[in-house]
Amino acid sequence: VRQKLAILYTLIAFIFLMTRGETSAADSTVAKSSAAEKRAVPVALDITNNGTQLLVSCRNGTVKRVQIDSREVIETVNVSQQLSAAKLHIAQRAYAVLDTENNFLVRLEVVDGKLKQMAKIAVPAKPVDLVWSQDGKRCLVASNWARQITAIQWNGNSSAKSAATVELPFAPGKLILLPDQRNVAVADAFGNGMAVFDWQELKLKRIAKIDGHNISDLAISFDKKTLLLTHQVLYYDKGTTRPAVHWGGVLANVVEGIDLESLLSDGNNSLTGNNSPTGNKEIFGNKERLTVPGKVYFLGIPDEAAGDPAGLVETSDERRIVVYSGVNQVAISDRGVNFYNRIGVGKRPTKIALSANEERAYVCNSFSDSISVLQVNPAKVLATIPLTGQTVEPTASERGEELFFNSKLAQDGWFSCHSCHTNGHTNHQLNDNLGDDSFGAPKRVPSLLGVSKTAPWTWRGTSNSLHQQIAKSVELTMRGKPVDKLQQDDIVAYLKTLLPPMSVHAARSFHSRRATIDPVAVRKGRSIFRKSGCVDCHSLPNYTSADSYDVGLKDELGNTKFNPPSLLGVSQRDNLFHDGRAGSLKEVLKEFRHGQDRELSDEQIEALIQFLMRI
């Protein structure tokens, strides 16, 4: 009865809710989320040169201009179906946004008081971040699934061309122009990768990695000597017991400071203690990938954790402002970063922008469709600016998405589902949990992209119910309170929206007719896949099957039978097998001779890899 009353009161609250925005409060309505009226979901914001307006880019494909003094949206422009990132170049008065649905870089400018599209250029899929050069004549775009960065040269404000496209050993996420104005730091979107791109030479200068994953933001310290990162560290050898989670022993939320001089060196720096069981040296091209030494600042304490740190800025008087995305808070430190004051904001705060005088900060509340206006010192919320004129009732999948990114599901708020399954994919790390009903044999965190069609679940294939697996993960991995049936339904609804990742080949050739894979080799590889029996375990259409198999691998507890993971999007995985012991498809087939009754020749292995890289 209480639950029914709670639902009734919630519905009544929705009906009478009035918000301020582009329409008057009297016109405010409740609407079902649809293609015509979706939640805005702000993903990026910038402050204009005179400090009077905010430019806010939203996942629903719109860019909004917000008047700061009146705290209202004064213009909304439809750019595409979905945007992922945006950056303002103040001197050029140009706003570059990324159309992640159609894979374009779009240039906007204010003309006669209105935002106007000036140019757009195709980029590899899936563009997720960009930076401008200091002079505003170039942009660098990170394309996630293509595992590439693309240097774009602007020809005035109405056209552009691609100057160079560079491949990476990881899926790129965040970018930042370094103080020398020549080099750009490139962060891994999921795992522990870092790179430095030399904009003058149009090539990679450095390949490195950190002890961590989920690099959510990059910033430069006030003295311009340190690159700051918000990220997480998953301790693969710590079982997810209640005490371990409570004391922060399973997953840590941190700000890491990397000395820029070390980052820009030739890579001869000393190695730090590496949390990964797969070693700390890798080779990409002719570059050795070393762990970059950094100073780690831990966020959160038992009973009051700081799950999923995101946006980050540092002021000239040495105050650090960090967005605690998973617990809906912003933390503002004292001078010298000795302690933080936390203030509550909207749901899933992500991006942050600082006013020129550093007295105000503006924060995107992604799931509240709003901007929080903060006073830096003393720390407090001054106002909340709504981005939509009506309250849109979330769908089941949208409620599930909110739960997926909510660190409060875990004990003390240490981590969310997203913390390990980054944006529904994987952080490429190992975790020792009770998914397989035992501790002592850490397993690779699987991607959840396409997961609704790959039953059974867990590495040993012991779960046939996605609802039960979700409930078990929250209670025994996250050590949170039990999730009810409605919450399980909502999370399942969200997981059903997650499609398998695009292959690297498809992402790189999205706008190009040039084949990145030999079609003859692909046909030959498909034939080998079928004739060699790979298809027996990795059956079409999802390239998996319901059984578990002994393929000559054994975990630490003696288990030898494992359920085969789907091979859809396998090119987007940094490590393979249940424990990540293989670092590439070539290693799987050549060194481990996986699934081969008869040894394949080098030519056959290459053809099979070409096929697998395409699916």
Regions inferred by a protein language model and the residue ranges of each:
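Hydrophobic core register within WD40 beta-propeller blades
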Residues: 45, 86-88, 130, 175, ...
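Short loop/turn segments that connect beta-strands within beta-propeller blades
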Residues: 67-71, 109-113, 154-158, 198-202, ...
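Periplasmic c-type cytochrome electron-transfer domains
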Residues: 178, 192, 202, 216-244, ...
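Beta-strand-rich domains and repeat architectures in extracellular enzymes and scaffolds
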Residues: 34-61, 304-316
